[in-house]
């Protein structure tokens, strides 16, 4: 397995402390990787800064060609990437290969095209004798911090728009799941000029802090927890860096009496438990109108009970393990606290799986109340709660009564209600009669404590640029 860092176009061994990387399906150590030293972090940033002098002046065509080449090599090595992701994250291999790899390739190809469509406003004379124009220019060095739930996907979401806009990047994947990013480093080094992409390994304290606080870094992009976002924003404040934050969610799923219950059950069975629920947009907080509440709980419980947890390389496996032992304990604690309330009923699941690995049973909890922690706090595991509601006004208020604001969905056959409720929900995305669907052309991002800034789409590309005014006297 490729375990070297990419700094200034060269693969080099880390000079810091060695850290174990685990296989969550077994609990075994896959390998140990040496972290980047503080000197290597500095070298990576300075290499990116030096490379920006030329890369920032390249044409969109040149940048697009590089992104397309990277997309091609990822596609060609799709099986290798999927196997690494499966071993390091515990994802079902078929899901990694069939779902994630094509989406990752598409992200790079989308931004290759978008790079050639980014324009400033047309020139005009707003002062007599002077012509003004608006430019969208790259910022410089971008520090990108990727999470452990979708390591390669999130690396793509961060690298593609930043590079397309003409920035240079220093990427730090999660120390829990670094293997696909390090493999990407091996392939990218021969496509992009030295220093344009740098990929490091290490923990937040030892590598993340010196990276995000570096004076030559002009922007920090994070997908992670609220706590990590707060830390990075504070850490970057003294140098007034731009920050781009995607900080998790607790998606409300509003099911009205007139909804297609079979579609809801099928949807939540998939969208609430995909990737073992380790997804910021997971359909995890259901509000069911009282007329269909009992039916939904019964049918959904039966459906969730059929989800198969198992070995990642088994074609029939639907849920793999959680990412780490520490995260397994967090999920277990959240469910135990819910059970201890006395009014929350475990419909199915509610316990760790016996045996090796970090497995938690797919869990459905009914009877949750609005103020319960299981409703208000992100669990980030295969755990879905159901809360009954009376009417539209009540459920909109409850849905918005959350510190999160990333994703939501509304299930109803009433088109007017779908529009009305969607307009009032304080979430970056609202799906109607579906959930979880993402495409490269549409923006992804939240509000409130879920963060700010957009991934994907032309809006995502614009986030990695600075607007400049140039005025020419005639």
Curated annotation (Swiss-Prot):
Homotetramer. It catalyses: 4-aminobutanal + NAD(+) + H2O = 4-aminobutanoate + NADH + 2 H(+); 5-aminopentanal + NAD(+) + H2O = 5-aminopentanoate + NADH + 2 H(+). Catalyzes the oxidation 4-aminobutanal (gamma-aminobutyraldehyde) to 4-aminobutanoate (gamma-aminobutyrate or GABA). This is the second step in one of two pathways for putrescine degradation, where putrescine is converted into 4-aminobutanoate via 4-aminobutanal. Also functions as a 5-aminopentanal dehydrogenase in a a L-lysine degradation pathway to succinate that proceeds via cadaverine, glutarate and L-2-hydroxyglutarate. It comes from the Bacteria. Pathway: Amine and polyamine degradation; putrescine degradation; 4-aminobutanoate from 4-aminobutanal: step 1/1; Amino-acid degradation. It comes from Shigella sonnei (strain Ss046). NAD(+) binds at residues 146-148, 172-175, 209, 225-228, 280. 4-aminobutanal can spontaneously cyclize to 1-pyrroline, and 5-aminopentanal to 1-piperideine. NCBIfam families: ABALDH, PRK13473.1. Its EC number is 1.2.1.19, 1.2.1.-. It holds the Pfam family Aldedh. GO terms for molecular function: aminobutyraldehyde dehydrogenase (NAD+) activity; NAD binding. CDD domains: ALDH_ABALDH-YdcW. This is Gamma-aminobutyraldehyde dehydrogenase. The gene is patD. PANTHER family: ALDEHYDE DEHYDROGENASE-RELATED (PTHR11699). Belongs to the aldehyde dehydrogenase family. Gamma-aminobutyraldehyde dehydrogenase subfamily. The active site is at 246, 280 (nucleophile). GO terms for biological process: L-lysine catabolic process; putrescine catabolic process. Keywords: NAD, Oxidoreductase. InterPro entries: Ald_DH/histidinol_DH (IPR016161), Ald_DH_C (IPR016163), Ald_DH_CS_GLU (IPR029510), Ald_DH_N (IPR016162), Aldehyde_DH_dom (IPR015590), Aminobutyraldehyde_DH (IPR015657), PatD (IPR017749).
């Amino acid at each position: 397995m490729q375990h070297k860092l990419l700094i200034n176009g060269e693969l080099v061994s880390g000079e810091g402390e060695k850290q174990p990387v685990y296989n969550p399906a077994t609990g075994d150590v896959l390998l140990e990787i040496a972290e980047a030293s503080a000197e290597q972090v500095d070298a990576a940033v300075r290499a990116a800064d030096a490379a920006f002098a030329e890369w920032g002046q390249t044409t969109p065509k040149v940048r697009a060609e590089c992104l397309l080449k990277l997309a091609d090599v990822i596609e060609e090595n799709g099986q290798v990437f999927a196997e690494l992701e499966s071993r390091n994250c515990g994802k079902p291999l078929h899901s990694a290969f069939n779902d994630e790899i094509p989406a990752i390739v598409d992200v790079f190809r989308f931004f290759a095209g978008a790079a050639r469509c980014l324009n400033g406003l047309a020139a005009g004379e707003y002062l007599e004798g002077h012509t003004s124009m608006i430019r969208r220019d790259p910022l410089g060095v971008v520090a990108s911090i990727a999470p452990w739930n979708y390591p390669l996907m999130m690396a793509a979401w961060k690298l593609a728009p930043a590079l397309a806009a003409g920035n240079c990047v220093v990427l730090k994947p999660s120390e829990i799941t670094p293997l696909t990013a390090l493999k990407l480093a091996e392939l990218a080094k021969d496509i992009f000029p030295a220093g344009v992409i740098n990929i490091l390994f290490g923990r937040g304290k030892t590598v993340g802090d010196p990276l995000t606080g570096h004076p030559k870094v002009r922007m920090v992009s994070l997908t992670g927890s609220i706590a990590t976002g707060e830390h990075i924003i504070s850490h970057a404040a003294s140098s007034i860096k731009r920050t781009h934050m995607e900080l998790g969610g607790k998606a409300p799923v509003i099911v009205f009496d007139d909804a297609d219950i079979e579609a809801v059950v099928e949807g939540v069975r998939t969208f609430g438990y995909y990737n073992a629920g380790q997804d910021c947009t997971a359909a995890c907080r259901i509000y069911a109108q009282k007329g269909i509440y009992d039916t939904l709980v019964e049918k959904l419980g039966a459906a969730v009970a059929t989800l198969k947890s198992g070995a990642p390389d088994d074609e029939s496996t639907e849920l793999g393990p959680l990412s780490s032992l520490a995260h397994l304990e967090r999920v277990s604690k959240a469910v135990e606290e819910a059970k201890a309330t006395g009014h929350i009923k475990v419909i199915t699941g509610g316990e760790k799986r016996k045996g090796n690995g970090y497995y938690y049973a797919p869990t459905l909890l009914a009877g949750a109340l609005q103020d319960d922690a299981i409703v208000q706090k992100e669990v980030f595991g295969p755990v879905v709660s159901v809360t009954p509601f009376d009417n539209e006004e009540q459920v909109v208020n409850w849905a918005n009564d959350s510190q999160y604001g990333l994703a939501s969905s509304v299930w109803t056959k009433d088109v007017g209600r779908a529009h009305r409720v969607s307009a009032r929900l304080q979430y970056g995305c609202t799906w109607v009669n579906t959930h979880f669907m993402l495409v490269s052309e549409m923006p992804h991002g939240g509000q409130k404590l879920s963060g700010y800034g957009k991934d994907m789409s032309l809006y995502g590309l614009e986030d990695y640029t600075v607007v400049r005014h140039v005025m020419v006297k005639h």
